[in-house]
Regions:
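Bacterial N-terminal signal peptides that target proteins for export
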Residues: 2-10
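Bacterial N-terminal signal peptides
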Residues: 12-19
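Contiguous, structured surface segment used for ligand recognition
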Residues: 25-122
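Aromatic-lined carbohydrate-binding surfaces of glycoside hydrolases
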Residues: 52-54, 66-78, 82, 91-92, ...
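A short, hydrophobic C-terminal helix/tail in secreted or cell-surface proteins
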Residues: 315-319
């Protein structure tokens, strides 16, 4: 058996270290080196990325140069991505947008004219609402979502709404509460109308949703939220506010489930009273199923009365 000497092993080890990309030691800068390579393939090696402290608690970025490299600094991955976008716009006169990119870059990137330092307005830069996804992104694949996530980071977004894969969360939750596969799938609206289901206006429109679609959305959602976290974003997940299938009343006849009024020609949704013990049980399972698929990241959205109204008993209405 051929043996490698200790000196040769040391040489191979050191040589391997020098072959590692510059971003290998830091996950935050690594994420943005990879973003740069996705947006401008072949150019990431011309940048040096550095993490700096925030500016009095505010996100900050810098664009600089040293005669050889473009130096981007920021206190978060999103701040670094924002610096990259600023450099493209104002040094390279390049452009990245929803409607097309202008990325006619020279082989050797130009140095910034001077050091630029900017703070980012707003601690929480929220992006998207439920309608956005169904209006625009209902049929996006991972390739499209990658571009959108890079665009978010380059435009300082750090708190995007996360809804892709919610149909899988609901499907799994309902199986815990005596719904069959078909009943659970029949509750779910099609992708083009899912927004209004998550806003608790309707159910079932465009259903029953095929299990293959539910599984595909779950797989896509896992990729999306992993990338959001990699880019240092804080995803907004779905909370449980008591919106439930109308059919839940048939399965739990003693539960306090109220029927909402009709909405835009659709039969009204059902609302589980938060004081009912079933609310706590169902909410816990919903959040557990969501965490099992996508993790639990601390910020949740829930609106039980979107374009609807509180339900009152006749006694309360008289007060």
């Amino acid at each position: 058996m051929n043996l490698i000497s200790k000196n040769k092993i040391t040489f191979i080890f050191l040589f391997s270290i020098f072959l590692l990309p510059a971003y290998g030691a830091n996950k935050d800068t690594k994420a943005i080196y990879e973003l740069i390579e996705r947006v401008t393939p072949g150019y990431s090696s011309q940048y040096r990325l550095e993490i700096i402290a925030p500016d009095n608690g505010v996100d900050v970025y810098e664009v600089d140069g040293n005669g050889k490299e473009i130096i981007l600094r920021g206190n978060t991955p999103v701040a670094l991505a924002t610096a990259f976008n600023w450099y493209l716009k104002y040094t390279c006169q390049a452009h990245v947008s929803w409607f097309g990119n202008q990325l006619n870059l020279p082989e050797k990137l130009p140095q910034p004219r001077e050091r630029e330092r900017r703070v980012i307005n707003g601690r929480y830069r929220v992006y998207m609402n439920y309608c956005t996804v169904s209006y625009t992104a209902a049929w996006w694949d991972w390739e499209h979502w990658q571009k959108e996530l890079d665009f978010m980071a380059m435009n300082s977004v750090n708190m995007p709404l996360f809804t892709i894969g919610l149909d899988a969360v609901w499907y799994n939750t309902l199986l815990h509460f005596n719904f069959s596969d078909r009943e659970a799938r029949a509750f779910l609206a099609g992708p083009g109308h899912a927004a209004w289901q998550w806003m608790q206006n309707l159910q079932s429109y465009g259903g029953p949703l095929p299990k293959s679609v539910i599984d595909r959305h779950a797989a896509l959602g896992k990729k999306i939220i992993a990338r959001q976290l990699e880019l240092g974003m804080q995803p907004i997940q779905q909370g449980f506010s008591g919106y439930v299938p109308r059919e839940l009343k048939d399965k739990y006849p003693t539960a306090n489930i109220n029927q909402q009024r009709s909405w835009c020609g659709f039969k009204g949704a059902a609302q589980l009273d938060p004081t009912d013990s079933l609310f706590t049980r169902m909410g816990r399972v919903f959040l557990e199923e969501q965490a099992r698929l996508f993790g639990a990241h601390g910020v949740y959205a829930a609106d039980p009365f979107h374009e609807s109204c509180l339900l009152y008993t006749s006694d309360a209405a008289d007060d």
